[in-house]
């Protein structure tokens, strides 16, 4: 007897682990589409700095949840979940198998486990006080108030840092302890990549990022949205902005971006290990192993 619940395939892994390339190979083999679960790739014009699938890759396989919003519009995990769930249900209604790919742990789990966001409206006074303190001090505060949350976000991400503090100061509860509830009525096959050569891959990707246009991309974003756009404080863009300001050389920017990305990848791996139940793929033959596991789940 076939399972009554529809199957949703999930591929997770830290940044630069090769998710995009593997996902495209899997999607081609099974003739399915990709739903990108990435907190920055959802924004238009942010291509090189987010390692967004190329136009060639997007033409080869249909991608959803890419270039959905303008960089000036903040999309939080709850909003992302709502957008993604609509996209997934649309495919399920067409009798297709959705394929979710990404490294944003909180966003992915908000989709596959159900998300209950803290009912805390924006606190203007609190936010202004945190902004005056500066990101470095706010990050140190968050490490004390909600250490688990700091494992899931980039330490330069002012928006999520302040939101974490805001929730804690208003409710007295950690944002990381927010409950996942009402999981969707799907069967989830969760696959994971855990590369042993991740540091080398991160360095190579960062070097390519600066060689192939992140500085020009950052200039264009600044010209359109201003240099204070919060997304320009995230990894890669912040360093590119400092090259433009002549505060860093390109070599220094590459080194700093690489270091930050490695630190972020470590936090991603910790999150996946503690919060997810992935079947980790065999590094010697990722595609073959993934195909075997997906075919078994499909029955």
UniProtKB/Swiss-Prot annotation:
**Residues that bind ATP:** 13-20
Q: Which reaction does this enzyme catalyse, per its entry?
A: adenosine(37) in tRNA + dimethylallyl diphosphate = N(6)-dimethylallyladenosine(37) in tRNA + diphosphate
Q: What is the E.C. number? A: 2.5.1.75
Q: Which GO terms describe its molecular function?
A: ATP binding; tRNA dimethylallyltransferase activity
Q: Which NCBIfam families match?
A: miaA (TIGR00174)
The entry's function note states:
Catalyzes the transfer of a dimethylallyl group onto the adenine at position 37 in tRNAs that read codons beginning with uridine, leading to the formation of N6-(dimethylallyl)adenosine (i(6)A).
Q: Which family does it belong to?
A: Belongs to the IPP transferase family.
Specify the protein name: tRNA dimethylallyltransferase
Query: Organism, per UniProt?
Result: Prochlorococcus marinus (strain MIT 9515)
